[in-house]
Amino acid sequence: MAGHDVQYGKHRTRRSFSRIKEVLDLPNLIEIQTDSFKAFLDHGLKEVFEDVLPISNFTDTMELEFVGYEIKEPKYTLEEARIHDASYSAPIFVTFRLINKETGEIKTQEVFFGDFPIMTEMGTFIINGGERIIVSQLVRSPGVYFNDKVDKNGKVGYGSTVIPNRGAWLELESDSKDITYTRIDRTRKIPFTTLVRALGFSGDDEIFDIFGDSELVRNTVEKDIHKNPMDSRTDEALKEIYERLRPGEPKTAESSRSLLVARFFDPRRYDLAAVGRYKINKKLNVKTRLLNQTIAEPLVDPETGEILVEAGTIMTRSVIESIESHLDGDLNKIVYIPNDAAVVTEPVVLQKFKVVAPTDPDRVVTIIGNANPDDKVRTVTPADILAEMSYFLNLAEGLGRVDDIDHLGNRRIRAVGELLANQVRLGLSRMERNVRERMSVQDNEVLTPQQIINIRPVTAAVKEFFGSSQLSQFMDQHNPLSELSHKRRLSALGPGGLTRDRAGYEVRDVHYTHYGRMCPIETPEGPNIGLINNLSSYGHLNKYGFVQTPYRKVDRETGVVTNEIVWLTADEEDEYTVAQANSRLNEDGTFAEKIVMGRHQGVNQEYPANIVDYMDVSPKQVVAVATACIPFLENDDSNRALMGANMQRQAVPLINPQAPYVGTGMEYQAAHDSGAAVIAQYDGKVTYADADKVEVRREDGSLDVYHIQKFRRSNSGTAYNQRTLVKVGDVVEKGDFIADGPSMENGEMALGQNPIVAYMTWEGYNFEDAVIMSERLVKDDVYTSVHLEEYESETRDTKLGPEEITREIPNVGEDALKDLDEMGIIRIGAEVKEGDILVGKVTPKGEKDLSAEERLLHAIFGDKSREVRDTSLRVPHGADGVVRDVKIFTRVNGDELQSGVNMLVRVYIAQKRKIKVGDKMAGRHGNKGVVSRIVPVEDMPYLPDGTPVDIMLNPLGVPSRMNIGQVMELHLGMAARTLGIHIATPVFDGASSEDLWSTVKEAGMDSDAKTILYDGRTGEPFDNRVSVGVMYMIKLHHMVDDKLHARSVGPYSTVTQQPLGGKAQFGGQRFGEMEVWALEAYGASNVLQEILTYKSDDINGRLKAYEAITKGKPIPKPGVPESFRVLVKELQSLGLDMRVLDEDDQEVELRDLDEGMDEDVIHVDDLEKAREKAAQEAKAAFEAEEAEKATKAEATEEAAEQE
């Protein structure tokens, strides 16, 4: 027997074909959400308060300090928040201290700071009753970046940018004349030496002393001449910078100094964030820049005078590691003192080394490091600016390297906690202005923190973020996998990110650093491709927001691959060589081969085993969760795998789903972490279990009650239904399944079913990927799903009186009220179809002025029907089903309703949808199709043992699409069904062809895994053997019931008066320009005329046509389409004098053209009568003529006789 058994949870064993030992379990799959929010509550929120506070008034006599905060219990439980359309949030109380510096008085007070949305255990938020997710954002990291560009003459120029988290950008660039310029905040450029002089190093000698003598420096110094001898060089530089930043304003050195301090050195205006300081220190640090360079002068220990490194030594990694403590200490540190007129007058500490130029061994190049400022320094320092300039100058000498902005070392993730912190900071900074003004205006003696703090800006910022930010999304709740994928999504869009239109191919493309961090496969098709990604299965965020992936450390001395796990970011990984997870190992953990496949800085090739530093932990660390659920992924083309991963997220939860026979082993973990199942929180024993709740008694005697949700409506209108898995007496451990969620079976993800599938054509019904299906799948409810829709009706106070929910509805027969209760609300369990009343409601309507007598009669007889109109809630067009639940909210019961609303009724209608022609089906390999025919079971082809096939697919759908995984799955699935087992074939480590054939043989199938099929209609065998097996097929959310639509009389667009479009608007079908051409081509003038008039926007024409049809009268001639009037008005609005004239050149009002249509009536009967009349008249005339002729002839004869 190939493979080995693996237990997944307590309910499922699978035969696994994996050969690679898993040394690390998958992390919790939603930790990116939960960990980030926890960090925000633990210290993120505190940091934001500390950033903005303390706040002083303008005279600096009062100061408001932050002391601490406390989050109280949420007002509603999760379930209550859902029912009441409320948010699941907790009140937050902040303690402030107000200090009067003149009197020394201190007032401490706790201030209510609004309700803050709290994340649920599932990583979601409930906002206004709807479950939402904050998608993590992928943004460019703050730091310093260097780039190169080639000009039209082929000359390479360099550029650099310091990008802060917030604040002004500082750029450097060189031109074709080798002069280096700087730009501050995208303004006009100035020579970089001007900025150096403004920083207090004004002499040319000082500049050469700092940067060394290079062509770029020399050219720039020559360009930057002293123009005004009255000013010092520093003052002149300051004024020049001020002129660039504030053109047209009077320039002084003092104002320029304060402007530059505010732009770069004020922590309130300029913030690198922890990550920016980390990236700058990493980039400008001398350790990374000295690597593999030849030192030009000996390195001497400043304390002992000992020579650490001789001149001419190549600084290899081992040499640098040997003097690392000195490099981090005071080695080669030089203190430069700026002059007194400088922007910042503190001494500047730099680390300076001289190395041999890589391009010219006779030249010496100076490398300046920023001497590693402390992590707490969140602004840029003069040392950073000088070190950046040094790196820039070094690039032209061949030292250092330019950055790739798509490298994941330069892109970081802002998860929910950071996005929220930014929002709170925004609100607090708006509040700050307000507080300052109140402190200055009001009397200091009586002021308290409560009086000067207005929390509205903060609560508004948070509310706006959750309600309308691009990153706050309604949770995709089609099935548990789509929930999980949504929580792990990474978006490059959103505020501070990219926009769809400006994102090029490079940003969207797969980058080598995505390996183990972002999935190369799972991304949407369409305009967002590559901008929205998914975290890989083992991906994890470090404290700076960079994605890390785990590797097994290789002991370089012994060559043993240890079980020690090291998490590396993309930057760190670039320094090492990493072997693939499927490299063969010996028993002792050493590599079996001398040469192994590995990666180093994106180069995939064979490397000697003795230079490998790390090894992948698992083959599935490359891909995301949905992709890791595709068996035989390695046999599929990536485009189809992308479709397969995306379509699993669109699977509809079925009534009784089955886990796949052929899985990947990922199904258990995905179901467990998705948040849709009920998981035991503690160890214990089940003491009570039914469909609604499970009670577990813990060992310490306390009781846990788990509530099971039955048929709740999910965000996407599917039934969210949980099923109890445990029985009384079962012992459960923490983390065990207590109940399956939707689309789960026995603790595993179960998106579809395991039908018997044959690859064969049948009467042409599976042309173009169509699917032929057996009636068994309909009859046995194999692909039946339940859908829930919510309808609501509210009564409001109107000017004419309150609306009322009642059973007494004007002009409605008793038959329509049979299922309403005495209040006028539908009963639970009633079957309803479109147009049925769900909630009877009447609204007062405006009265005509009645005479006194009429009013008296009204008052006496209470004739209600004339003063109210029917505004009942009815089942909308195209819907039907059974009433599942009714919820009533009233002010009397203490429910919170919007102002003006007295009562709110919600009706839930459940609809059972069997599979039908037009529904979309798919496998897991991107093989999708539409059901084209449902064939009776007796007509379906059958196997030699008499089993009829369930589904027939077109064999032509496989070769050109190159998703061969489906064929492998088919054969292995048939073997699993025959053997009565479930199989796990993990991605990139699954069943080999030998495993596949040995399992097929074990199941007693034929050696080609094909079989003879018999035609169900004739009983004859088909000519050729057919591939038949079991394939996992899912029903997708694109169902024909949601798409089929027909319009009778419906709404029209206000301006053009043409019918609206789309099913939601009960719209019509668009008869467009090309369709008009078709009718013109055939000369179908009458059809064309009515399509362009009655059926579209001829207002009078269509009214009269409707009237004529209902009364059985002839249809009048059409009038002028409204769109012609719109065109005329539009031309007139452009100032063109356009008028319509008749034959006599008299102007005709457009409205007049429709007048007198009734005279030109065409009536078929009249035509017949007219014809008959004309024929009779013609006949009479003919007879009269004949008679006249006869008379004349007779007269002539008589005359002749008389003669």
Curated annotation (Swiss-Prot):
Pfam family, one: RNA_pol_Rpb2_3
Keyword Nucleotidyltransferase: yes
Biased composition (Basic and acidic residues): 1174-1195
Keyword Transcription: yes
Any one GO BP annotation for this protein: DNA-templated transcription
Annotated keywords: DNA-directed RNA polymerase, Nucleotidyltransferase, Transcription, Transferase
EC id: 2.7.7.6
Taxonomy, superkingdom: Bacteria
GO cellular component: DNA-directed RNA polymerase complex
GO molecular-function terms, A-Z: DNA binding; DNA-directed RNA polymerase activity; ribonucleoside binding
Catalyses which reaction(s): RNA(n) + a ribonucleoside 5'-triphosphate = RNA(n+1) + diphosphate
Region (Disordered): 1174-1203
Role, per record: DNA-dependent RNA polymerase catalyzes the transcription of DNA into RNA using the four ribonucleoside triphosphates as substrates.
Subunit structure: The RNAP catalytic core consists of 2 alpha, 1 beta, 1 beta' and 1 omega subunit. When a sigma factor is associated with the core the holoenzyme is formed, which can initiate transcription.
Sequence similarity: Belongs to the RNA polymerase beta chain family.
Protein name per its UniProtKB record: DNA-directed RNA polymerase subunit beta
Protein species of origin: Streptococcus pneumoniae serotype 2 (strain D39 / NCTC 7466)
Gene: rpoB
